[in-house]
Amino acid sequence: MEKTKNSKKFWIALVIFSLVGQVAWVVENMYFNVFIYKMWGASAGAISTMVAASAVAATVTTLLIGALSDKLGKRKIFICAGYILWGFSICSFALIRLDVINALFPAAASAAAVGVSLVIIMDCVMTFFGSSANDACFNAWLTEAADTANRGAVEGINAMMPLLAILVVFGGFMGFDLDKRESWTAIFLIIGITVVVLGIAGFFLIQESSIKAQGNAHYFKNIFYGFRPSVIRGNPVLYLTLIAYAAFGISIQIFMPYLILYFTVTLGMDNYVLIFAPAIVLAAVFTAFYGRVYDRLGFRKAVLPALILLLVGYVVLYFFRSTAPVFIGTLLMMCGYLAGMTVFGAMLRDFTPENKAGMFQGQRIVGQVLIPGIIGPAIGAAVLQNAETIIGDDGTTSFIPNENIFLAAFIAAIFIFVLLAPLFRKLRKR
């Protein structure tokens, strides 16, 4: 098989679009929870609702835009224009402030309730643009730009970006007091403008995919293409991988929406960035090389060590609260998380039917975002239902996350091994 020749522009586009896109997602997935918790006194249920609504928006968007980009045979315009609009939508969060809400809704009984509702609504709007650009079209473009000879290497770089994005965000957030509203205004403007600039740069960096538009002419049929029983039967490895990936994502989403709050509120680690940074750097380096394990040894020998690392990380985080063990547990958990994403992501790309990458991005999002985004945070919220509470300076009551989120994540992760069994059997028969 002839190896895909990737230009320098491809690697530059891969790194910066993946990194900046992940920075935006990190702020949404890890800090929007902090934003509505600190600024609006949101409950665990409200946080779970926000994550679930965003997951639904991401899935529907990816299904619609993925099929549309296949029909038109275009990726570049959706990526670039999508990033520009994505950036503007991020900037709009700078306007969700108490003074603005009081001016627009003077009769509202609770400005906090209005604030939480606006954040959830605008999160869905932002997710529409972000999923159009990143989930649907950037991922489809990436699938088409690589092949089985370098898939693991490309996916390794792509999969380590969430960790690097966390490092960038954590480092950047050190200069802000997250208890002050003006800090959040600056954060949303800085990130939003950066995403807009990148979208403009994409017109000069991204080379259009070679997908043929005339081969995918039936738009509405394409939207539901991946859900047809005949397609599922014809691609058993792909769908078994999606099911296992969904279980993996559920385990992650049980604790992830509450992770920063757990470290800052429960453990009182105001210097959590200094603890996270070394763990993130080491995990990012580990992930960059781990993609080659998939290339050389295959899925089975790559996914099992990743899951074991994840489970050990959960155990350490559940039993220990002091700085050193928390660092070790975080490192192991992050290594397992990102390595697992690398392996599952590469597997999905390798078994995506040729010239139908866009139509299958919706199915990827169902397994990677929708199912985990609805079930995971709901389990986390149920676990925290009777958690201790504190009363803030403004009189609002807030919950205190506890270590049981890691126990629940561990139990959920055990089911991944059960779901991998039929997948391994299918792979042995190939």
Regions found by a protein language model. Give the residues of each.
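Structural signature of the two symmetry-related core transmembrane helices
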Residues: 77-92, 301-316
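Glycine-rich segments within core transmembrane alpha-helices of 12-TM secondary carriers
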Residues: 58-59, 152-174, 365-377
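Helix-loop boundary and gating motifs at the non-cytosolic
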Residues: 2-55, 237-267, 273
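Helix-to-loop junctions at the C-terminal end of transmembrane segments
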Residues: 60-74, 286-299, 384
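Juxtamembrane intracellular "pre-TM" segments in multi-pass secondary transporters
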Residues: 1-8, 209-243
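Hydrophobic core of transmembrane alpha-helices in multi-pass small-molecule transporters
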Residues: 19, 89, 96, 103-133, ...
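A membrane-interface helix-boundary motif in multi-pass transporters
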Residues: 75, 176-193, 384-412
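Multi-pass alpha-helical transporter architecture, strongest
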Residues: 93-100, 196-206, 402-430
